[in-house]
Design a protein with these regions (language model features):
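Histidine- and aromatic-enriched segments that form or immediately flank copper-ligand environments
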Residues: 62-186
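Short, intrinsically disordered low-complexity segments
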Residues: 12-13, 48, 91
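N-terminal export signals
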Residues: 15-39
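N-terminal secretory signal peptides
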Residues: 1-15, 22
């Protein structure tokens, strides 16, 4: 009688082998994980293929530590934005001479802009497009901060008239210190 109670709640041989087979497949499939390309570039390329957003201007904006000769002597440690244009012409991004500030980004009303922000700094950050009329999720709100090594994709249409607008970091409680160190551009 005790033997019947034990076998009623137990797995049968076939069911056990079936579950063991599924487990083995799961372990083997999981073992390929380190070989899958999860680089930021491949993730952005995959997102581009899925997106129906066709930008007129497409660039990467990278926040990173740098050393810049601001005064004679030793270079000054700063944080700065660097841009790489993927589409739209290299003349759309201008690095101001003798400045540690970020590049000037030229965009026109009605253009669709894609900016791939990557944070290579030792603290969280996000980019706020000061004065531009963009959707809330694209406005660099502090709740969207990204950690070091992470990225945030901005896609928006420029709806503003011609003017000078600046962009800057917008992490909660760290906007000022990050701007003072050089994270700002036009």
């Amino acid at each position: 009688m005790a033997n019947q109670e034990f076998t009623t709640g137990s797995l049968g041989r076939r069911q056990f082998l079936k579950l063991a087979g599924y487990g083995t497949l799961g372990v083997l499939a999981g073992g390929t994980w380190p070989f899958i390309d999860l680089s930021a570039a491949s993730q952005l390329e995959a997102a581009d293929r899925k997106s129906k957003f066709l930008p007129d201007l497409d660039l990467s904006l990278i926040a990173r530590p740098a050393q810049v000769p601001i005064f004679p002597g030793e270079p000054t440690q700063v944080w700065q934005y660097q841009a790489i244009v993927h589409k739209g012409g290299r003349d759309r991004v201008i690095k101001p001479p003798r400045s540690y500030l970020g590049p000037i980004i030229k965009a026109h009303r009605g253009e669709k802009v894609r900016i791939r922000f990557r944070n290579d700094m030792p603290e969280k950050s996000i980019v706020h497009w000061h004065g531009l009329h963009v959707p809330a999720i694209m406005d660099g709100h502090p709740r969207y901060v990204v950690s070091q090594g992470e990225s945030h994709l901005y896609e928006f249409e420029v709806k503003n008239r011609a003017s000078t607008y600046w962009y800057h970091p917008h992490p909660h409680g760290r906007t000022g210190p990050q701007v003072y160190r050089g994270l700002a551009g036009l």
